[in-house]
Amino acid sequence: MIFKSQDAQKIIKHSVNMSIYNTKEQCINAAVVYQETEIGHSEEFYHEKSAFIYYIIEGEGKWIIEDVEYDVEAKDVVIVPPRKKFYFKGNLKQVCVTAPAWDEQYEKHVQFIDLD
């Protein structure tokens, strides 16, 4: 399967600009999203089914996973297993892969985050 950048769905979600390359209907095993943010993701959440795997392309920031803070920078990989709450802060460009593919019904809100 090939998914082209120009065909990606563009959205803004919780302060993050996202290009969604594919949906679960196109590939149930994984979904790929390119993300850019200047401040981070302003919602703490978890997903009941999918692991979230992030490759940091550019920038630096902080990831908060299960209330533990981790520093990240370009070329780092972050893996968040299913059912682990998380959010992130910082000026970042990154690729997120969810496996299995992200499904909205399994994403659960924990709290909104003030990133100021």
Task: For every predicted segment, state its role.
Residues V33-Q35:
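Compact, glycine-rich, soluble single-domain proteins
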Residues K24, I64-V68, N91:
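Short strand-coil-strand connectors
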Residues K4, E66-R83:
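Short acidic-glycine-tyrosine-enriched beta hairpin
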Residues M1-A31, H41-E44, H109-D116:
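A short, N-terminal "cap"/entry segment at the start of jelly-roll beta-barrel domains
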Residues H47-A74, V110:
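A short beta-strand-loop-beta hairpin characteristic of the jelly-roll/cupin
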Residues T37-I39:
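Forkhead-associated
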Residues F45-E48, F86:
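Histidine-centered divalent metal-coordination motifs
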Residues P82-K108:
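Ligand-binding loop in jelly-roll beta-barrel domains
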